[in-house]
Curated annotation (Swiss-Prot):
Membrane topology classification: Multi-pass membrane protein
Primary gene name: slc25a25
Function: Calcium-dependent mitochondrial solute carrier.
Ranges in the topological domain labelled Mitochondrial matrix: 253-289, 347-382, 444-482
GO annotation terms (biological process): ADP transport; ATP transport
Name of the protein described by the UniProt record: Calcium-binding mitochondrial carrier protein SCaMC-2
Amino acid sequence: MARPRSLVSPLLSGVFCQCDTVSGAPHSHETPASPSLAAAALAADPCGGLLCGGPEHERRLQILFQELDVNKDGAICINDLAVGLKRLGVHRTELELRKIVKAGDKDQDGQLDFDEFVHYLRDHEKKLRLVFKSLDKKNDGRIDAQEIMQSLRDLGVNISEQQAEKILKSMDKNGTMTIDWNEWRDYHLLHSAENIPEIILYWKHSTIFDVGENLLVPDEFTVEEKQTGMWWRHLVAGGGAGAVSRTCTAPLDRLKVLMQVHASRSNNMSILGGFTHMIREGGFRSLWRGNGINVIKIAPESAIKFMAYEQIKRIIGSNQETLGIHERFVAGSLAGVIAQSSIYPMEVLKTRMALRKTGQYQGVLDCGKKILLQEGLSAFYKGYVPNMLGIIPYAGIDLAVYETLKNAWLQRYATSSADPGVFVLLACGTVSSTCGQLASYPLALVRTRMQAEASVEGAPQMTMSKLFKHIVKTEGAFGLYRGLAPNFMKVIPAVSISYVVYENLKLTLGVQSR
């Protein structure tokens, strides 16, 4: 269903520059049949926009501010904005209104005074102008359906021409099936969204979803985010969210490792039985064995993956700010291989610490020292091959499923709302991550068993292929999925906790929520 067309009154559009961005010619208004007193005052059209600073500039802003200041207290609150815009024929959701006030509220008193209001409009128009130019691929001062399709395609979203025309019609006031600068600006006036590509930015997910396996393809960051330092704030927020999430779900993660290594047909370990065994052997605190090193490795792995991803993007020669789906998969998988190769000894330490018995090691350093002395340096790379092979199905299937779900939602709802909402984001991320884990789980199990070989009494030293054959022969295909139940049990709480902590850390670090 197409988005209802927003009829912007002359009072609103009059506060902006009315010059055509290409020719510089003034853009004429059609005077309404029954204009209000305030609108009539703005009917004259000398260039009085925010950026041009014409003679009518200050007066127009004052009149608009007074119209929106419904209770006449010298400030615009969310309720004033809702009522005032509705009177002027502009309808915004409560969430959009909150974002507008938050974006302009410099003193954080929950409302906009005149100076804050002017600053918000000035800043907003500059952003809108930059976005308009980026979408105007033909450089002719107008955006058509093909340019909308191309812009979204560059960001990994494929929509039909019919869908693009629906988006176009929601902004096209004169029926030309193109959008000029004034139509673009008027439509987005006092709207929290700043661009069509922002639809995509809602769908960033790898920094939010931490389910214990950091194998997702990295998110894209815009040039603006890189220049302003927002990229590292996102990574720090994601790392903090991952640390809290992993700590909260650590008992399930340790149970998964125990079942992967010790469960078999002769030792059919249940979830309840596994927890009982851990508590009896080492007490309640033993449920968190291996969690420390699992949290510590988040920072180096995320940093190395991000840097590798950016370098690989340059090597493959992409001049685009964001990559296509296939390029993202290749670059993301290679970045994952580099990051995992760099921190893989920490993966082995995590497995050994999770499997340790009470008193076996004094800590992570003691564990590493004993492995080095007793097994040699090569022990820190046991299970390396299946781990690397697991990156491809995990990252590929997660990306493919997520993009499929994203496109399905956008095809149906993007013309009525850019924001998919928390539930849709969490649901899509959970489903795609679960599918990725399911596909790569046999490789993950073989990796864990190879990492644990020397710590398990009587365990045979096998290559990856021999271990696969041994498991299938002795336990059947089901043996490749030991520990899958606790692994899936932790997905929903892990994703939910990650999201909540991530959003709160973003606010603390000063990252503006989209």
